[in-house]
Amino acid sequence: MLKSLKQLLRTPMKTCLFFLLMTAATALLVLGANLWAQTQAQIDAVEKQFTTLGTVEQKPNRTQMRTGWNAADGAYYSEAEPVYDSVISADVLDFDGANYLKAPEKRLYYLADLQGLAVRDGGTALFYPVVEFTPAETAVPDHSIKVYVQRFLYPEAENQNNEYEIYVCDHWTENPAPLEAGKTYVAYTNVIVNHHENAKSSIEYALIAAERSTQCDAGGNLLESDMQARTFDEVTAGFYETERGQYWLELSKALSMWDTTAPVLPVTDTALLPSFHDRTVYVREGRTFSAEDLENGAAVCLVSEEFARKNGLSIGDKVELPLYGVNEKDSPHRTFGDGSGLRTFSLLNAQNRAYTPFWTAKYEIIGTYYSVGTYGKPAGSIEMALNLFLIPANSVKADFAGNIVDNGPMQRATTSFQIPNGTIDDYMAAYNRNVPAEVRENLEITFDDNGYSQIIGGLLNMRYVAIILFAAGLLSALAILVLLLYFFIVKQKKRTAIERSLGMSKNQCRVSLASGVVVLSAVAVILGTVASTVLFDKVQTLDLTGQNEHTFSTEYSLWARDENAVETEDAENTGVLEVVIPAAMTVLTAGLSVILVNRSLKYELIEMLNK
């Protein structure tokens, strides 16, 4: 082998040139391979960690002004409200080419009466009582008039007597009927600040018109109710045995149940919930739903950390959920977002009766979730709410067609679907082809991929660069190897003939010719690999994919945890490549060297001397 190396050193310039070229080609080849493997690992990690969620909202056909009377101002007020000519079903999104990972779903939520658990702090009872009262004098209640409370139907109170004075006003009626002294009346009231001039009390009990049922059938149609929209009724002998009297008792019963009501959201997959998708909600203790839980409808649930702490609940405890109402219109956040329980639907059915449970079961707590930003967001803009229970949708095995408290169009917080990452343009093209224009103009689809498009773009560019480096290194290494073997083996036939003439065996000739070339190549390959490792470490410190470019700080973002995981994702096989590639190149050099030497040894000595 030493003689072989000495022969190489007889042409130092050529040997040095091939050595440096082989070193550079190997460095380029290994660097390209490492970058390719590293980038591919990051792409795979991004594909696993990121999802693309689409949300759907039906736009109103128009808005109309709803007017009402304000007795304190002595004038009408106006409020804009949306008008929908019809409700578009989520089924219109089932079209060719959609390629859903998870098909569109319009989520409903249940109302559960949690007797014995802390749900709210009595807001409804304090500000929306049902009162029996007797006027101190006959008067028209277009201003605050003094009355004596006979009793509260809701909330029930101890030691009720007629010495309790309050001031009532038929605040929202332009020409109210008079209240007569000595008679007893019952009314549903709202405690508000008294803005009347010369008011004798800082607060007043504003009379509220009778609740008209918002119950809908299974097709989403509003059921007719014969309730008269009066703000009060006179209480006479036997009044509560009449249909009108039963209304007040049922309303009081429903309001009492409402005080202990919490929302329950049935889940088919937490990946379809926008708050779980954007990581503003995540399970911090216990576990989330398994695929088996969701498919089999296991009686398990997730509750908020705050609710569990407030009620002394922990993982493994069971909570009974009597479900009595179904809201197919809004997300739980619209009513329960801040915990106040202010409703946009009636608690009475079309027969003016309180709803009764259609499904009751005990659910085991398997995890508690932490929620960021439930407060302070516009009502109904997200699906999460205070005291919200999450349960598998398949766990409710009863028909609830008779308990639908409201129905309405698709909203971003209630309707979502999932598509493969990077296919938003393909989806919208199929959507525009297959969904009629008159439907599309009334729907608004919004996508959120959590920054996947920006991150994957940089990674794909980096992979393209890595492939180019790898290809350039591979072609360069092969070309240099061919030239190396040509000059130091193929062109050495005369040398082989002389060595054979001097009595060297064929094996000795093989060693003489090939060993030096193999050693030279091996050393160059090793140095090139070392150089590529240093370069690879330097490249990893650079932001070549643009992942770190932000227009805002993510230091305190929940999503930043996952972004960092992607940025620091290492390919498990980069170390293997730094061994396999040099070894393969060395073996290839040795193999080709032996093949070429054997080919030369087939010639006769005289023939080789003439080469």
Predicted regions and their residues:
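Alpha-helical transmembrane segments
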Residues: 14-72, 531-540, 544
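Hydrophobic alpha-helical transmembrane segments of multi-pass inner-membrane transport and secretion
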Residues: 13-40, 457-497, 517-535, 581-593
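Basic-flanked hydrophobic alpha-helices used for secretion and membrane insertion
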Residues: 37, 41-107, 163-167, 176-184, ...
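Short juxtamembrane loops and helix-capping segments at transmembrane helix boundaries
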Residues: 535-577
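C-terminal membrane-exit region of the final transmembrane helix in multipass inner-membrane proteins
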Residues: 4, 484, 571-611
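N-terminal Sec/SRP start-transfer signal
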Residues: 1-30, 514, 602-604, 610-611
